[in-house]
Amino acid sequence: MNNFPEIFDDESTCDYDKEIDHQELSDTFWCLMDFISSKHGKSVADINSGMNTLINIRKSLNGSGKVVSITDSYNKTYFHSQRGLTNVDSRINIDILKIDFISIIDDLQIIFRGLIYKDKGFLDSADLLDLDKKTTTRKFQEYFNILKIKIIEKIGMTKTFHFNIDFRNTISPLDKQRKCSISSSHKKTNRLNDLNNYITYLNDNIVLTFRWKGVGFGGLSLNDIKI
């Protein structure tokens, strides 16, 4: 059912020598979110007809971008990178539609997540924080660049990184208490050093999560990532 192997080829590689235009990346994200938003309430088959947009996005990111999944608030899958389009006769009219978009930059795997609300349409950070889109994008860029530099300085680029941006309508009291946190936990594996370390920064309705897998923090402390 997946008619777009060019997008979802897991063996695709990136030209890491190419300098990444972070403005282009941000513009690409908004472009993708606007496209998905325009399809809200229509059948997934309609989204299928717009996949050429994703092909162009992928090329603009030097072949590194792909959509991972499209699910609703009941975790019903409309699209998955390995299974292709599903439920093609369904209507996307559940409460919330979650979109994950991945781009790999300098060994950093960046996961963008947008939420589409049935009653309000797509809400991005500009809607939630009452800021113009350019200002919000710039703040995200600044945060990402600072965080990336600090991580590289501390532990280098030898690990697998994940950076999530998650727009939420509400933030739980527990999340607010965490505000900005560092933590690590052992996975249930035989390798005691197989850690999943993460940093979460909350700003009103935006949740940013930065995770990496490796041994320990490499000297990284909470003071290193406060901005």
Swiss-Prot record:
Where in or outside the cell it occurs: the entry states: Host cell junction, Host plasmodesma
Alphabetized, the UniProt keywords read: Host cell junction
Iron found in the keyword field:
no
Extract the InterPro entries matched here.
Answer: Crinivirus_P26 (IPR009985)
Q: Which Gene Ontology cellular component terms are annotated? A: host cell plasmodesma
Signal peptide residues are none
Q: Could you list the residue ranges that cross the membrane?
A: none
Q: Which Pfam families match?
A: Crinivirus_P26
Q: How does it assemble?
A: Self-associates.
Entry protein name: Protein p26
Q: Which organism is it from?
A: Lettuce infectious yellows virus (isolate United States/92) (LIYV)
Q: Provide the organism lineage as a comma list.
A: Viruses, Riboviria, Orthornavirae, Kitrinoviricota, Alsuviricetes
